[in-house]
Regions:
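Iron-associated oxidoreductase/ferritin-like identity signal
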Residues: 1-152
Length: 152
């Protein structure tokens, strides 16, 4: 097993927090959204909750394997302002844009970890490459939703 790189552990911890926060926000949004136009978005978000939790489990296990400590709820740092429930539960576009912002940030984080672990920690890199592919899939799906919603 490679010696734990503090930068990699810090970035993995950020990714772990982001995955959990995304799952929490997807859960809230999949319940709070209202309206006929919201149904497909709610279904997509509800389906992605388990994927995001699965990502957090993979990342958390890797943090532990590298000698780090997986954070508990009191030390998590959440900051997805754009994914917070809207006062208007029919504002589907705001939710879609929040998902896009969240997935874009996750993609940046995984790309950072992939670069930090390149040539040093192939297991971490492999986990992040696979997770990156999932996040890119989520981003593509919600970009497609946004295109449809922004048509006039």
């Amino acid at each position: 097993m490679p010696k734990a790189n503090p930068q990699v552990l810090k970035a993995l911890t950020k990714a772990y927090e982001m995955e959990l926060e995304t799952a929490v926000n997807y859960l809230a949004q999949s319940i709070n959204l209202d309206g006929v136009r919201a149904e497909e978005i709610k279904k997509a978000m509800a389906a992605d909750i388990q994927a995001e939790i699965g990502h957090a489990q993979l990342i958390g296990n890797r943090i532990k394997q590298l000698g780090g400590t997986v954070p508990g709820s009191l030390t998590l740092h959440f900051n997805q302002k754009l994914l917070q429930p809207s006062p208007d539960p029919t504002d589907v576009v705001a939710v879609i844009k929040g998902v896009i912002a969240s997935e874009t940030e996750a993609i940046k984080t995984y790309n950072t970890i992939i670069k930090l672990s390149d040539g040093r920690d192939y297991v971490t890199q492999d986990i992040c490459i696979k997770t990156l592919a999932d996040e890119e899939g989520h981003l593509s799906l919600f970009n497609g939703f946004l295109k449809e919603y922004e048509k006039k």
